[in-house]
Amino acid sequence: MGRCPAGVVLLTDRRAARGPLVEVVAAAVDGGVRWVVLREKDLPRAERLALAVELRAVLADVGGTLIVAGPDPLDGDAVHLPAAGPYPPPRLGLVGRSCHDAAELARLTTEDYATLSPTFPTRTKPGYGPALGPEGLRELITASPVPVLALGGIETPDQVRACVDAGATGVAVLGAIMRAPDPAATATTLGSAFEEAATPMSRTPHPTAEIPTRGLRPTVPTQGSSLTARSGHGRPQPPTATTEERQ
């Protein structure tokens, strides 16, 4: 696939959702979400596959991506694996891994990205922790060989900004959007906080991650331009001043 999740990444939970799951996800996509992780691992494969087909259709119109939790990609090409395994990871277009400490990060081999959790105390998994906090998150991101999504208890714009400041290339969100009275508005609010914090003036993103533009379809390179050039990586540098210019 050639890119890693960034921005606001939505994790599904049909039991927490305030409406039908596909409708909640569609609203979040309207609010700017472009990455969705399908959980619902308790469903029979046939039902989960049907749900994956529906969610892929929702994401297709905006160039979004569905990632499936677990080793079975459900006829897709992107999975998110638990810390427990399998190892080595399957050969697919995009593979993520849940991590919680430096030892688990050290086990990464060919994964494309990782989540680190819990960043903050979470209502979804009460008592799960202890929470890393922004500083703990920063320390682990520094040691990570791959881009990192912050996960766990992220519900406010300030928390999103703290994660970006710690070096996260995205924030994985469940309850804040699933339980929201207006999932689209919540997704927009959190996405705006991410974009503001992730501007080039405030931080440099991990070189293999993309920062999505909320509400826009993927950009197609035009003549004389490239995605690499527009992202800032590989951009021509200004000429070095001569000795005379420096005097």
Protein language model features and the residues they cover:
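Conserved N-terminal beta1-alpha1 strand-loop-helix module at the mouth
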Residues: M1-A78, P88-P89, V95-R97, A102-D112, ...
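Charged helix-capping and loop-helix junction motifs
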Residues: L49-V53, G129-L137
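Non-cysteine beta-strand/loop elements that form the S-adenosyl-L-methionine
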Residues: D112-F120
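A short acidic, helix-capping loop that chelates divalent metal ions and anchors anionic groups
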Residues: F120-P126
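Intrinsically disordered, low-complexity polyampholyte segments enriched for Lys and acidic residues
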Residues: E210, G234, E244-E245
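N-terminal amphipathic/hydrophobic targeting modules at extreme N-termini
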Residues: G215-P221, S225-P239
